[in-house]
Amino acid sequence: IDAFIQRKQPFAVYRIPGEKVPRLLTQAEGAVCLIYDLKELNGQRGFVIAPFQVSETCPVVLIQPDQWGQPLPIDNDTAEEREVALRMQGQESFLTSSTEEYASCFHTFINALRDNTFDKLVLSRHLTIDKVSGFSPLSIFRAACRRYIHSYIYLCYTPQTGIWLGSTPEIILSGEKDEWNTVALAGTQPLQDGKLPQIWDEKNRKEQA
């Protein structure tokens, strides 16, 4: 994986909830496909990297792999790679938005909601963490797979998008032919003894109502 990044070769590796082995897609030939209208995705096959809003400066990127679904074991990283992943998890030195910057953004959000410009907004903070020596995107992906066993985990790269690593328990869209499904989760609960809690607390019941 790290070699793909070094030679700027597009790829995506992902682990579906319930599966133990991630799948790897690679594109060795040609450039990725840039799409400026979601309708152009009809009939296409590949791994999609999409922004919230498609524009001329921020198109959908489609990795069209030459090789599909190669298994990628997650338990064969070295002791050194595991140590780097642990150091990244325990990193305390990072940069984030200042209180003044965050308060200004929050004020803008509140005004937009009060004016009914938007029905819902989500204000998030960003963290900038120093990269530790020996950092490996693959090691962090493997660590995420071990930690978030019920989530969809992905690591993808293209020269146009850079490196993206993500994790979500939500099914954005799944199905085939005339039957499709989606899931929207408002609640968040920590694992208990490695399993999802069977009883929801009051906070999560309200968010799902």
Roles of regions detected by a PLM:
Residues 1-31, 129-132:
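Short Lys/Arg-enriched alpha/beta "domain-start" segment
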Residues 9-16, 119-121, 151-156:
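A short, Trp-centered hydrophobic/proline-enriched beta-strand micro-motif
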Residues 14-21, 50-56, 157-160:
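Short, flexible beta-strand-to-coil junctions
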Residues 20-21, 31, 171, 188-190:
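Short, surface-exposed beta-strand-loop junctions and turns on beta-sheet-rich folds
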Residues 26, 42-44, 174-209:
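Cytosolic ligand/metal-binding cores
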Residues 28-130, 135:
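Non-catalytic accessory segments adjacent to catalytic cores
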Residues 50-52, 125-127, 156-160, 167-169, ...:
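Short, structured patches in soluble enzyme cores that scaffold and shape functional sites
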Residues 133-176:
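SIR2/sirtuin-family catalytic core signature
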